[in-house]
Amino acid sequence: MAELTISSDEIRSAIANYTSSYSAEASREEVGVVISAADGIAQVSGLPSVMANELLEFPGGVIGVAQNLEADRVGVVVLGNYELLKEGDQVRRTGDVLSIPVGEAFLGRVINPLGQPIDGLGEIASEEDRVLELQAPTVLERQPVEEPLATGIKAIDAMTPIGRGQRQLIIGDRKTGKTAVCVDTILNQKANWETGDKTKQVRCIYVAIGQKGSTIAALRKTLEEQGALEYTTIVAAPASDAAGFKWLAPFAGAALAQHWMYQGNHVLVIYDDLTKQAEAYRAISLLLRRPPGREAYPGDVFYLHSRLLERAAKLSDELGAGSITALPIIETKANDVSAFIPTNVISITDGQVFLESDLFNRGVRPAINVGVSVSRVGGAAQTKGMKKVAGSLRLDLAAFRDLEAFATFASDLDAASKSQLERGQRLVQLLIQSENAPQAVEYQIISLWLAGEGAFDNVPVEDVRRFESELHEYLGSNAAQVYEQIAGGAQLSDESKETLLKATEDFKSAFQTTDGTPVINEPEVEALDAGQVKKDQLTVSRKVSKK
């Protein structure tokens, strides 16, 4: 039988180790109780230390955002299915302010406003979390907007140019091509992305607010087919989502954009559209019993958009010189730009592109109203070559619109007015572009310069677009060095101008119009006098009748 030995030293050591590892601290956790839950809003009691915008956890994995902090209760915006909540459910604080994961892996993905993937392609590896409501860069952290961001749309790049770090509003009625303008801008960044040069590459974020799920799926398919999805992230809050998601979606897009901007990258963010965000915020505010103001919007709806759009900036060189360019979209009703939300956003942004339904219905697409559209950055965001050729374009088009309106009532016009009217009609055709077909800057500059030189004046109006397309194909093989010169940022030299004019004249001689008439009218050959004809050079043939 084994002898049992007891070591007092071992017992003493074991007790000492156990007591030293014991902590007398008690963890404190605040737990609230659901008083009521309806219409996406939950009223919770018993969370005295909760922070504004703090995430709260409900049973079943449902989360919410603390909004109204009152003495005896908290108004919570539920992000999820509020129908799962019932009176008496426990609510726990998370201690985290609303934030989303960010990182390079988000390119090419579709996410919800919480940063969770919804495209069925698996989890996304994030680099860090970034707070949604982050402070915008200060005045001293910014630099002036001077680098152009080409949209590929002639009417915008020439007359209302957009620079990196700018906020340019796209405004118009429904079904006027607002989304198409922004999608073309995304597609136009493909050439820069393929260079691999960080200073040229532009990452794109498309924030879809309150749109149909089928529309978002179609847009993703378009980007994928055009090869633009690899540098684009889609933040989707479709119409079927709760109002809270539509309210937060633009801030999620801005947080992801700021992550890349502070790494020295250039980002383009499209908010489609902020009207629906404002309506969602109005619904939330009314359900939270906040006092309504004009058009029932809450008093801080201006601050909602200003703090979002102020995050677009061109950072100073000390901070990496990154940028966020914002293209917010606003939908008007009956072209009324004086409504509450449109006037708010117009006052916040650095210019607007106004799309008009009348122009759209007449086939002028993009349907940009030149008289109302403006860019407050202006020529600072244009290349030297574009600034040179586009200087008088806006005035020429504005004069054409006035003359066109006058010509409908005037029966007779002088020769100068007729010439101006005909050139204006061709300019309008030249600025029309097909959807998903952005044009490189060098092509735009050559087209606009040739139009200013009268190269399109004798081309039938219905053939202008086909003439331009075939002309660029011809010039691409006969004047390729001119395209390379402009693409490098240089202006058109005198030698290049001569080359273009000569090549254009050569092309005109072979161009076939729709009605078969020549573009270049050859001078008529005068008949010779009888004395100038040498009789020995004449051969007369007669038909001999067969008997």
Curated annotation (Swiss-Prot):
How does this protein lie in the membrane? Peripheral membrane protein
Q: Where does ATP bind?
A: G172, D173, R174, K175, T176, G177, K178, T179
Where does it primarily localize? membrane
Q: What is its EC number?
A: 7.1.2.2
- The superkingdom listed in its UniProt entry is Bacteria
Where is the protein found, in the record's own terms? Cell membrane
Subunit structure, interactors included: F-type ATPases have 2 components, CF(1) - the catalytic core - and CF(0) - the membrane proton channel. CF(1) has five subunits: alpha(3), beta(3), gamma(1), delta(1), epsilon(1). CF(0) has three main subunits: a(1), b(2) and c(9-12). The alpha and beta chains form an alternating ring which encloses part of the gamma chain. CF(1) is attached to CF(0) by a central stalk formed by the gamma and epsilon chains, while a peripheral stalk is formed by the delta and b chains.
Q: What does this protein do?
A: Produces ATP from ADP in the presence of a proton gradient across the membrane. The alpha chain is a regulatory subunit.
Family the UniProt entry places it in: Belongs to the ATPase alpha/beta chains family.
Specify the protein name. ATP synthase subunit alpha
Q: What gene does the UniProt entry assign to this protein? A: atpA
